[in-house]
């Protein structure tokens, strides 16, 4: 992926308008299939995230299949040199977003969206990335929170790069800096080091 990125960057500097290199990563993270632990790769995101100049590579980690196309269209509209989608297994049932209090799937195009908004003063913020951990949060944690657990904001990271591409005002509107003071992150990928 690095060589196509260098080639695309050079071509654009020379006035040529090359196409984006699409590096499809299939269903990555721990629960990738019925035998998930035998062919999972939690390191894969680390190989492409933060290893390119800003804007040269966009990754997406949708939580559900209905987020894939909006994320893809948004990512490709920014014309990155490399587009690296990590998609979920199509057999996952769609969550009832309205019942859970989650944002509509189209909000994934912002890169970060709410799975749950605190009803009052939030006791904290949970930021989730990766469909494996995300599914556990949707199926087990959100119902428990809604049934009387701590009043938390829960956000999902569908694309760090798309979120970072937003204007600062929009960025701060979705995830205000003060929320980060009480935030914890949950991911099923190994973070870049």
Predicted stretch roles:
Residues 16-21, 25-46, 52-54, 59, ...:
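Thiamine diphosphate
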Residues 1-12:
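Long, structured ligand/cofactor-binding scaffold of large enzymes
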Residues 63:
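TRNA-recognition modules of translation machinery and tRNA-sensing kinases, especially anticodon-binding
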């Amino acid at each position: 992926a690095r060589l196509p990125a260098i080639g695309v960057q050079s071509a654009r500097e020379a006035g040529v308008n090359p196409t984006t290199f699409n590096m499809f990563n299939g269903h990555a993270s721990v629960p990738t299939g019925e035998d998930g632990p035998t062919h999972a790769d939690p390191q894969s995101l680390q190989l492409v995230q933060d290893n390119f100049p800003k804007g040269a590579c966009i990754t997406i980690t949708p939580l559900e299949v209905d987020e894939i196309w909006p994320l893809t269209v948004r990512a490709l509209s920014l014309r990155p040199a490399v587009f690296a989608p990590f998609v979920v297994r199509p057999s996952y049932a769609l969550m009832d977003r309205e019942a859970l209090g989650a944002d509509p799937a189209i909000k994934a195009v912002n890169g970060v969206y709410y799975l749950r908004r605190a009803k009052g003063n939030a006791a904290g913020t949970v930021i989730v990335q990766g469909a494996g951990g995300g599914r556990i949060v949707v199926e087990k944690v959100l119902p428990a929170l809604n049934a009387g657990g701590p009043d938390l904001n829960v956000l999902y990271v569908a694309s760090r790069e798309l979120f970072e591409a937003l204007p600062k005002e929009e960025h701060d509107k979705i995830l205000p800096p003060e929320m980060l003071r009480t935030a914890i992150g949950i991911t099923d990928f190994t973070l870049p080091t």
